[in-house]
């Protein structure tokens, strides 16, 4: 049994106007400002693969339940974490939150157990096995999620039905 959970683009606190972004490194051809663009095809890119981060200053505390990365090039051994805090460079205060995000191909995300409220959010990536020599992603995911009030029934499913329609004319 599974639930369907989503975050609308307009509700993504990581890409709204008014929040400011800083990063450990940035490739000038793929600037940090691309993360505030709705187009996944215009990614942000780092210049390294180890200890890379993007920090979001939301301006004021925001409620978050869904976190993640969209359209990334991370290897399956990448260590992905999110830190939330009340001061820049969160992680030093015992009240700060630290969440590990499970790697998934192209989209890595996590639905938090409880809503977290902080002003500063830092996405950390450490990917020593990345053969590209850089880290790239199109969007940070940060916000409240919507979970439908119903879920899938056990045993119920669907299957794609493909038909290959072929018609040979009388001349081949």
What are these regions (language model features)?
Residues 67, 139-142:
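Extracellular beta-strand elements of beta-rich domains used
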Residues 62-74:
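A short beta-strand element within beta-rich, extracytoplasmic domains
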Residues 52-54, 65, 78-80:
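Short beta-strand/loop motifs in extracellular/secreted proteins, especially
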Residues 90-96:
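Trp- and S/T/G-rich repeat-edge/linker motifs of beta-rich repeat architectures
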Residues 1-59, 145-172:
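Disordered, acidic Ser/Thr/Pro-rich linker "stalks" and the adjacent N-terminal cap
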Residues 75-88:
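Short, surface-exposed beta-strand/strand-loop-strand elements in extracellular ectodomains
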Residues 51-62, 96-139:
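Beta-sandwich interaction modules
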């Amino acid at each position: 049994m599974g639930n369907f959970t989503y975050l609308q683009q307009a509700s993504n606190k990581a890409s709204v106007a008014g929040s400011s972004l800083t990063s450990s490194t940035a490739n000038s051809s793929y600037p940090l400002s691309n993360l505030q663009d709705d187009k996944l095809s215009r990614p942000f890119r780092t210049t390294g693969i180890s200890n890379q981060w993007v920090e979001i200053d939301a301006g004021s505390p925001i409620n978050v339940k869904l976190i993640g990365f969209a359209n990334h090039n991370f290897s399956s051994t990448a260590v992905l974490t999110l830190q939330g805090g009340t001061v820049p460079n969160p992680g030093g205060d015992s009240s700060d939150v630290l969440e590990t995000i499970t790697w998934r191909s192209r989209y890595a995300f996590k639905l938090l157990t409880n809503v977290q409220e902080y002003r500063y959010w830092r996405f950390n990536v450490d990917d020593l096995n990345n053969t590209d020599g850089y880290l790239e992603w199109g969007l940070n995911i940060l916000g409240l999620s919507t979970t439908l009030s119903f879920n899938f029934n056990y045993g119920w499913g669907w299957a794609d039905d493909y038909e290959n329609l072929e018609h040979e004319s009388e001349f081949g």
